[in-house]
């Protein structure tokens, strides 16, 4: 999957003061690790929780969290946020997924009929989580964006599926078998993409261990900075709003983003969409939810644009200019 293509709308021409904050590339190695994301190629066998714990141990950090659980027998793309980065994992919570599944049919299947059934399953479907599930087993709707037959060899088929978050691939295979009248079960599953993070950029546990060892023993963090992505990458798929220096600390303290605090933003986005708030140096401040659409923001001179849901930037990284303004207004009153 490719990230959405968006245009940048400039609201105020603004510069940023070099005295506070820093571009992500200028963080020290220790800071870089604390504010990082790894796109892991999870092997078959361990659970998602286990591999996240191993990453935490390798990097010597207190926290590591994964987005989108993979069952032990499933391999593939598993985004893991490191340390402070776990605060904004929700940015990936509802991201689309792409899987490649190996299905075994319990009887002979005509290829044309199989392709027709795959076409029928595209769109909104009803699903009930399987018996062995961590969530409540109630009927729910999920969107299937595409189902493509990559290969059919006898009773085995390789199927690529692009689905909404929370869709059970195993259940789709089972239901396809039922519609075909022969029955089917899933023999193997690999996740090849989460949103626009693909297996092409995924790294292994050994890659992480080697990169950390080279930095610790030889002082070279080049490999480590390739293996770990800056936490800003967790918002790669989200519309971005760049915030003026004067508004950054208010957001760090949980305040909503108001129109006067915006320098520029990506369009389009709609009311209710997740948005990522950045400094003019390219640092991720946090993740919020749009209170108005981007077309309305273009015309706004005041009013609230987004509520702040999660903050990753440390308070005090930028000066509390909002406090000075509030105090000045209080004194003048």
Curated annotation (Swiss-Prot):
Which domain of life does this protein belong to?
Archaea
Key words of the record: Isomerase, tRNA processing
HAMAP family named in the record = TruB_arch
Tell me what this protein is called. Probable tRNA pseudouridine synthase B
Is tRNA processing included in the keywords of this UniProt record? yes
Organism taxonomic ancestry: Archaea, Thermoproteota, Thermoprotei, Thermoproteales, Thermoproteaceae
- Catalytic residues (positions): 71 (nucleophile)
Give the Gene3D superfamilies listed for this entry. Pseudouridine synthase (3.30.2350.10), PUA domain (2.30.130.10)
- Which stretches make up the PUA domain? 238-313
Biological process (GO), any one: box H/ACA sno(s)RNA 3'-end processing
Q: GO: which molecular function terms?
A: pseudouridine synthase activity; RNA binding; tRNA pseudouridine(55) synthase activity
Tell me the organism. Pyrobaculum aerophilum (strain ATCC 51768 / DSM 7523 / JCM 9630 / CIP 104966 / NBRC 100827 / IM2)
What the protein does?
A: Could be responsible for synthesis of pseudouridine from uracil-55 in the psi GC loop of transfer RNAs.
| Catalyses which reaction(s) | uridine(55) in tRNA = pseudouridine(55) in tRNA
Q: What is its EC number?
A: 5.4.99.25
């Amino acid at each position: 999957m490719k990230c959405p293509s968006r245009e940048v709308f400039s609201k105020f021409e603004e510069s940023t003061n070099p005295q506070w904050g820093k571009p992500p590339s200028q963080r020290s190695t220790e800071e870089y690790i604390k504010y990082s994301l790894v796109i892991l190629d999870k092997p078959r066998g361990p659970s998602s929780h286990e591999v996240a714990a191993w990453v935490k141990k390798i990097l010597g950090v207190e926290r590591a969290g994964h987005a989108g659980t993979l069952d032990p027998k499933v391999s593939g793309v598993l985004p893991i946020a490191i340390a402070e980065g776990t605060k904004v994992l929700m940015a990936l919570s509802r991201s689309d997924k792409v899987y490649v599944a190996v299905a075994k049919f319990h009887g002979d299947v005509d290829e044309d009929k199989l392709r027709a059934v795959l076409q029928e399953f595209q769109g909104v479907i009803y699903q009930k989580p399987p018996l062995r599930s961590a969530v409540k087993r109630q009927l729910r709707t999920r969107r299937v964006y595409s189902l493509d037959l990559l290969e059919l060899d006898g009773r085995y088929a390789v199927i690529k599926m692009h689905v909404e978050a929370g869709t059970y691939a195993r259940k789709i295979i089972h239901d396809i078998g039922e519609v075909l009248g022969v029955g089917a079960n899933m023999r193997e599953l690999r996740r090849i993409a989460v949103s626009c993070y693909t297996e092409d950029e995924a790294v292994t546990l050994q890659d992480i261990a080697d990169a950390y060892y080279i930095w610790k023993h030889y002082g070279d963090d080049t490999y480590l900075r390739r293996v770990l992505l800056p936490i800003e990458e967790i918002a790669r798929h989200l519309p971005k709003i760049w915030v003026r220096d004067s508004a950054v600390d208010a957001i760090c303290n949980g305040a909503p983003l108001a129109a006067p605090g915006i320098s520029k933003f990506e369009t389009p986005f709609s009311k209710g969409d997740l948005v990522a708030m950045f400094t003019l140096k390219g640092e991720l401040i946090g993740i919020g939810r749009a209170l108005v659409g981007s077309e309305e923001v273009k015309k706004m001179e005041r009013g609230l644009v987004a509520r702040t849901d999660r903050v990753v930037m440390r308070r005090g990284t930028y000066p509390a200019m909002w406090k000075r303004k509030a105090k000045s207004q209080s004194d003048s009153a």
